[in-house]
Amino acid sequence: MDYLDSFEVPSRTPEQDVVAIYAAALGHLPTVFKHLLVVRSHLMKPLGITGVSYGDLARPIDTERSYAVGDKLGRWTLFAKHRDEIITGKDDKHLDFRVSVFRDARPRIVLSTAVMTHNVFGRAYLATILPFHRFGVAKLLGDASAAGRI
């Protein structure tokens, strides 16, 4: 593993389904984050890194749907779904990543990211985005908690 992090906040809604928690935490991007992601997509496209559009970022996550492993959950593929955790992510030629949203018994919500790079482009990309990633994930989780969504 080339990178691993975890952020956690208290849960105000311990009975909430993990898909709803995922949507509450990751489905409410501030406008500046959307702009950064779209700019990143344009810059990385020549390297073969698939990006996102404003349309991709505007689509809400359907929390009423029953998701199965292999389905798209938001922008990423669902790799695992359990009562208290879902894992999404994406694999490409430069790096693979996973995002875990876990509800523990305390009750707390833990959002973790794991990244495995495959080549120099993946390592360079990871090094470039890490400061934004750390700030962004902490902000998304904190905002979701402060707003009472999780």
Please annotate each region the language model reported:
Residues 2-8, 85, 108-110:
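Intrinsic-disorder/low-complexity, polar/charged segments enriched in Ser/Thr/Lys/Arg/Asp/Glu/Gln
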Residues 48, 52-70, 74:
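Helix-adjacent hinge/juxtasegments
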Residues 102-121:
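Short acidic, glycine/tyrosine-flanked loop/strand segments centered on an H-E-D-like triad
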Residues 65-105:
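Hydrophobic-ligand binding "helix-grip"
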Residues 139-140:
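Glycine-rich, low-complexity intrinsically disordered segments
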Residues 115-136:
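A short acidic/glycine-rich loop-to-helix N-cap element
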Residues 145-150:
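Short, highly charged C-terminal tails/helix-capping segments
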Residues 1-58:
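Hydrophobic ligand-binding cavity/cleft-lining segments
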